[in-house]
Amino acid sequence: MKWKTHKLITRAVCEALSIPNSEEVVESSVFPDQHNEFFVSNGKRVRIKHHSPFALKAAWRHILKARKLLLQGKDCSEDLGMALHYIQDYSVSVTRRFLFFRWRSEKVHDEREEELAELPVPRDAIEEGMKIRDPNQLKKALFSEKPEEELERIMYTATTLSAAAVATIFYPVGDGSGWRRAVALHIAAVASPLLLALIGGWLWLPLATVLGYAVHKLDFKYHRAKLERDWFRP
């Protein structure tokens, strides 16, 4: 997106939600275009491409950091603005389609961004995004995002998710009270495969370990409870 569009969406969302230091957030929403960020892949530092799935991971990382800073009474404007930048950029598809074929096109990308800069921010998208204030719902919505090709859909998606991110950081629902029950059930579930080793002998230990790890990864209730707990813990 053009800087004009980033700032337009970010300012509209921050004003609608009465966010403090809103202009600092607005200015930070263009930082990723000024300062490259990197992730590590196969031992190498690779620049985060704003229209790749790594942009969503970068956005989520900044969202988590912004929430922590807010809980600690510190300024979260920079991380919040950078998160919104990645969310907004990823909503723009950079591909062209013809029949069943699809390919990346810089020309299409540039044309879409030029035209987006002339669109108004959809107020109904802000209202829709404000309905999401649960961190687990935000995470699901964020990582379910798909790049859009139609201009109105791009603007709507970018605005909705931007509003959801801001609302969840500043006005979250929940309190993390289900954490203790979730962790108790999780420990019991992860430990249960060890019964194989106790009953069948130590030769079963490797399989029991693998099963325990699988149970840990697939215990979605535990991971949701953990995110909610962490959301309210400085």
Q: Residue spans of the language-model regions?
A:
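Short alpha-helix carrying the canonical HExxH Zn2+-binding catalytic motif
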Residues: 76-88
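Transmembrane alpha-helices
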Residues: 173-226
